[in-house]
């Protein structure tokens, strides 16, 4: 899993989002603040597949009626080169990313599915409220 940071690409400041990436210990980490949404290039890096394979699976998902229209797209990201706007890259929501992971057969996709299942099975923290009755001044 080779990660390449392209300094020519900038993320729009108005579009605050998170994305998934890998640590050196082959663990999924969430980076950024906001809802998870990823571009095709980020998805190819995370799932360790070629763009062609990823694009084919994405097109299949988008054409199927299994996803609600709101789950299919998470907006667009501005693409800049030499400080000039060159175009837009579609962003895919977490729902689409999870569905896509079940259509890919890479080791990274398998580990991502395990991570998602682990997070779902992990019990949520329970906060016990404490109510103070009567005079609370000491």
In which residue ranges do the predicted regions lie?
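Key DNA-contact positions within bacterial/archaeal DNA-binding proteins
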Residues: 52, 56
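Residues in the recognition helix of alpha-helical DNA-binding motifs
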Residues: 57, 61
């Amino acid at each position: 899993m080779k990660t390449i940071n392209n300094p020519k690409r900038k993320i729009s400041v108005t579009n605050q989002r998170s994305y998934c990436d890998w640590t050196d210990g082959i663990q999924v980490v969430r980076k950024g603040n906001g809802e998870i949404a990823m571009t095709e290039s980020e998805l190819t890096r995370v799932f360790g597949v070629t763009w062609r394979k990823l694009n084919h699976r994405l097109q299949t998902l988008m054409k199927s009626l299994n996803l609600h229209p709101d789950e299919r797209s998470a907006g667009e990201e501005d693409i800049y080169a030499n400080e000039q706007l060159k175009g837009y890259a579609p962003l895919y929501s977490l729902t689409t990313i999870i569905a896509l992971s079940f259509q890919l057969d890479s080791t990274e996709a398998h580990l991502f599915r395990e991570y998602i299942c682990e997070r779902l099975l992990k019990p949520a923290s329970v906060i016990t409220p404490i109510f103070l009755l009567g005079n609370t001044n000491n």
